[in-house]
A protein has these predicted regions:
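Short, glycine-biased loop/turn motifs at secondary-structure junctions and
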Residues: 1-105, 109-113, 119-121, 127-129, ...
Length: 211
């Protein structure tokens, strides 16, 4: 495990190499402890893990203790419950309750209930119930039920039940068991099991409805 100074230098070199934004780089530059470094990482979670891919779950495990990661709300393995703010990556499973906010990446799994908010990237898996809100990108998979709201981007896959609401963008794929899916953008596909229809949109203007 690197010393704090070695770790700080390594992270700054990686951030500079990947053209980090000024604010994010400054947070790392001004860091006085490993806790500060983790704050810089969580404040720029999407960029660090998905855009730049400058580190991964293994890097976190190799350079921070499980206690240090947990104090920052970061989970890379095992099962955890959160009702505040959490960041999941690696093989972690997080159950989010109340008004919790979880950002998930990699192969992480999130189970969201109540008014929890989840942002899922990579190949993360999310099960959303109640009035949970999910934003899914990359190859994320979401199973939504209750009054959950999902926005699916890239190649995300969504299965919707109950009164769930889904907005499908890019090349996302939605299996709709509710009949409530009303937005398809770019190249999204919605398979409506409730009304026995398939909706396909390619580009900005062409919409095809198949009975």
């Amino acid at each position: 495990m690197k010393t704090f100074e070695e770790l700080k230098e390594d992270l700054l070199e990686r951030a500079k190499k990947h053209n980090a934004c000024q604010d994010g780089y400054r947070m790392g530059l001004n860091a006085k402890s490993k806790k500060d470094l983790l704050e810089a990482i969580t404040s720029n979670w999407f960029w660090v893990f998905r855009t730049s891919k400058m580190i991964d779950a293994n890097y976190l495990e190799d350079n921070f203790s499980e206690e240090e990661l947990s104090e920052a709300g970061i989970y890379t393995r095992k099962e955890h419950a959160s009702n505040t703010r959490a960041f999941a990556c690696g093989s972690a499973t997080v159950e989010a309750y109340g008004s919790a906010t979880v950002e998930a990446y990699g192969s992480a799994t999130v189970k969201a209930y109540d008014s929890a908010t989840v942002k899922a990237y990579g190949s993360a898996t999310v099960k959303a119930c109640g009035s949970a809100t999910v934003k899914a990108c990359g190859s994320a998979t979401v199973e939504a039920s209750g009054s959950a709201t999902v926005k699916a981007y890239d190649s995300a896959t969504v299965e919707a039940y109950g009164s769930a609401t889904v907005e499908a963008y890019d090349n996302s794929y939605v299996e709709d068991c509710t009949g409530n899916i009303n937005t398809v953008s770019d190249h999204g596909i919605v398979k409506d099991y409730y009304n026995h229809k398939i909706y396909i949109k390619k580009g900005k203007f062409e919409i095809i409805e198949i009975e």
